[in-house]
């Protein structure tokens, strides 16, 4: 590209993002990028600007050193290696991004005045937890076509189908009756038997006597779009709906190639053509998901024998074993018993050399496995329990609950929790169609952008690590390992599966094929 035209394009691209380039920075970029054609330039400049915005900027005037660091980061990102193909990411290793409403961008924690996360959170962490959940849903809702006013209104009726979000504060400031208003807020029960709607600006009492509930599980502490009218300090709700979901591609089109997911790659793996090609070519890749793998039960070990025997001729890429790993609740002998059970599993795996050499094994702890209580995220099983197994089966990973899996360009979240029953028990109003619970459940999780949209006394969370439970941007696959009946549901381009409880569901499990994104139901009953 001609230097003069390149300079103009550079200035324009940075100005669109609200940034200005110093003369020496323009000169450096012109020399670096002059060999690129038009299409390559568009792709590369977006990555460079994304890398610039990740750095702590005190002003919108971009210096040479900032640009040099961004170009260097992009060069490293392009140098993809085999380590980016398959990664298990623990909950405590996920990067934290905070939404900045002024810049309308997500910025890394290092660019904010918030402290580094700590298990023993402060009161500020608890307040920040709900504020961050709210701000993520608010920016997503504002961007939805129903809430985006047309740039040019040709006819007054054009904007009638558009909605405008109000805050609780605007309701409380009115002495007259306010008709037809929509508010985004969190359902809370500040007084027993009375529900309120809360947002960062205030709290208003709700009258739900005439409220219609759209599909989903409306629990306390979940965020809703409430439509109704306000009078005498009470918001009379006509209808409740969830904030609209947003496909991952839409989110990334707006925020660029930020790696929200975690892993070794500096940019999102979604942008990698090399990894996408590897993913398409490797048609034999296969992931096997099992939950409630009770290793202390002889029948379970026998069925695992049968499963390994069946897969020995074509070993899966990875087996994902979710807890609980013991049928008995936590007790004084459980740790010793679990060590022995894992040793028995390792011996079975060693009987099948092809699986032992080729397959990986990932273990996600369950709510009743040994650990520091029921607070999420849960750390992995203790090293002294798993040491012998890891020596016998080197390709094994004991990870957190929840955890994330990055395979080529695909992003998978795995969560072991009996969540369906918990959410049904804590519904403000139970859905009329109880036959369709899996669809209600999946819609709720993806709309909330969070794995546990429940009160903290029902599902406790380490306040400063609440971001590790986010489901935003929407992953390619969400595995909720629950004792509820197995299901497979697709929503917002996300495949959501529950393998069910292995011993309780006739030894059923799920098999996922990443190359064509299909899920197969499998069962060992009667074999």
Swiss-Prot record:
The keyword Nucleus applies. Component of the DNA polymerase epsilon complex consisting of four subunits: the catalytic subunit POLE and the accessory subunits POLE2, POLE3 and POLE4. Belongs to the DNA polymerase epsilon subunit B family. Keywords: DNA replication, DNA-binding, Nucleus. This is DNA polymerase epsilon subunit 2. One of its GO terms (cellular component) is epsilon DNA polymerase complex. Pfam families: DNA_pol_E_B (PF04042), Dpoe2NT (PF12213). GO terms for molecular function: DNA binding. Its main location: nucleus. In eukaryotes there are five DNA polymerases: alpha, beta, gamma, delta, and epsilon which are responsible for different reactions of DNA synthesis. The gene is POLE2. InterPro entries: DNA_pol_a/d/e_bsu, DNA_pol_e_bsu_N, POLE2. It is found in: Nucleus. Accessory component of the DNA polymerase epsilon complex. Participates in DNA repair and in chromosomal DNA replication. PANTHER family: DNA POLYMERASE EPSILON SUBUNIT 2, DNA POLYMERASE EPSILON SUBUNIT B. Gene3D superfamilies: 1.10.8.60, 3.60.21.50. One of its GO terms (biological process) is DNA-templated DNA replication.
């Amino acid at each position: 590209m001609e230097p003069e035209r390149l300079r103009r394009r550079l200035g324009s691209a940075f100005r669109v993002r609200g940034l200005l380039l110093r003369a020496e920075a323009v000169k450096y970029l012109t020399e670096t990028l002059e060999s690129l054609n038009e299409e390559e330039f568009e792709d590369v400049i977006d990555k460079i600007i994304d890398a610039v915005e990740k750095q702590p900027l005190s002003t919108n005037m971009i210096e040479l050193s900032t640009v040099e660091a961004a170009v260097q980061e992009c060069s490293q990102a392009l140098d993809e290696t085999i380590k980016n193909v398959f990664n298990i990411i623990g909950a405590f290793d996920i990067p934290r991004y905070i939404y900045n409403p002024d810049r309308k961008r997500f910025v890394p924690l290092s660019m904010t005045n918030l402290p580094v996360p700590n298990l023993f959170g402060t009161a500020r962490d608890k307040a920040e937890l709900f504020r961050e959940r709210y701000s993520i849903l608010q920016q997503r809702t504002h961007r939805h076509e129903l809430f985006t006013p047309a740039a040019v209104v040709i006819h007054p009726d054009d904007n009638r189908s558009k909605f405008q979000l109000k805050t609780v504060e605007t309701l409380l400031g009115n002495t007259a009756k306010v008709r037809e208003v929509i508010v985004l807020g969190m359902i809370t029960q500040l007084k027993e038997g009375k529900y309120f709607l809360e947002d960062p600006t205030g709290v208003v009492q709700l009258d739900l006597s005439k409220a219609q509930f759209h599909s989903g599980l409306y629990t306390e502490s979940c965020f809703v779009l409430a439509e109704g009218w306000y009078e005498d300090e009470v918001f009379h709700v006509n209808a409740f709906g969830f904030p609209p979901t947003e496909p991952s591609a839409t989110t990334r089109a707006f925020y660029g190639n930020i790696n929200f997911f975690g892993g070794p790659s500096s940019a999102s793996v979604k942008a990698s053509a090399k990894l996408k090609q590897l993913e398409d070519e490797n048609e034999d890749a296969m992931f096997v998901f099992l939950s409630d793998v009770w290793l202390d039960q002889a029948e379970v070990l026998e069925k695992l024998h049968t499963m390994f025997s069946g897969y020995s001729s074509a070993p899966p890429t990875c087996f994902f074993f979710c807890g609980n790993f013991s049928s008995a609740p936590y007790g004084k002998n459980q740790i010793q018993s679990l060590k022995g059970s894992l040793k028995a599993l390792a011996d079975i795996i060693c009987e099948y050399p092809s699986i032992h050499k080729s397959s990986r094994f990932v273990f996600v702890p369950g709510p009743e496995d040994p650990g520091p209580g029921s607070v999420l995220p849960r750390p992995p099983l203790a090293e002294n329990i798993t040491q012998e197994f890891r020596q016998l089966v080197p390709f094994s990973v004991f990870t957190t609950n929840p955890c994330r899996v990055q395979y080529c360009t695909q992003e998978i979240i795995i969560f072991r929790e009996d969540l369906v029953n918990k959410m049904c028990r804590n519904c403000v109003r139970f859905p009329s169609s109880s036959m369709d619970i899996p669809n209600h459940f999946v819609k709720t999780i993806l709309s909330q952008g969070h794995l546990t949209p429940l009160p903290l006394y029902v599902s406790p969370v380490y306040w400063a690590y609440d971001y590790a439970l986010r489901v935003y941007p929407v992953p390619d696959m969400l595995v909720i390992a629950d004792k509820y009946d197995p299901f497979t549901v697709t929503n917002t381009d996300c495949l959501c599966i529950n393998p069910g409880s292995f011993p309780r569901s006739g030894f059923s499990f799920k098999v996922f094929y990443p190359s064509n994104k299909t899920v197969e139901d499998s069962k060992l009953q009667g074999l």
